Amino acid sequence: MAAIQGIEGVISQLQATAMAARGQDTHSQSTVSFAGQLHAALDRISDRQTAARVQAEKFTLGEPGIALNDVMADMQKASVSMQMGIQVRNKLVAAYQEVMSMQV
């Protein structure tokens, strides 16, 4: 969590510098934080995995209206979402490490 806070701090400093260079007030920036966006994305990934698991359980129990192709498609969507989340995390960690290794 400290890495996310560090990245968020660097991003907010860069945004403030960019706004100051453009002559804008730094207090008028949006209130959506990087950590908030990241948390929302992780929640969506979790929701997609939960929905796929529930649908697979319903199919296994033989509930009517649940087709195998729908279950497989939802499970694949959940898998792709998870892989995307892992890749985003890897890119964030690499960017954070690069910023931290910069000399001031």
From Swiss-Prot:
Per UniProt, what is one GO molecular function of this protein? cytoskeletal motor activity
Q: Which domain of life is it from?
A: Bacteria
Write the record's keywords in alphabetical order, separated by commas: Bacterial flagellum
Q: Name one GO biological process term.
A: bacterial-type flagellum-dependent cell motility
Give the Pfam families listed for this entry.
Answer: FliE
The keyword DNA-binding is annotated on this UniProt entry:
no
Q: Does the keyword Repressor apply?
A: no
Q: Which family does it belong to?
A: Belongs to the FliE family.
- What is the protein's name according to its record? Flagellar hook-basal body complex protein FliE
Q: Which organism is it from?
A: Salmonella paratyphi B (strain ATCC BAA-1250 / SPB7)
Q: What is the lineage of its organism?
A: Bacteria, Pseudomonadati, Pseudomonadota, Gammaproteobacteria, Enterobacterales
Q: Which gene carries the instructions for this protein?
A: fliE
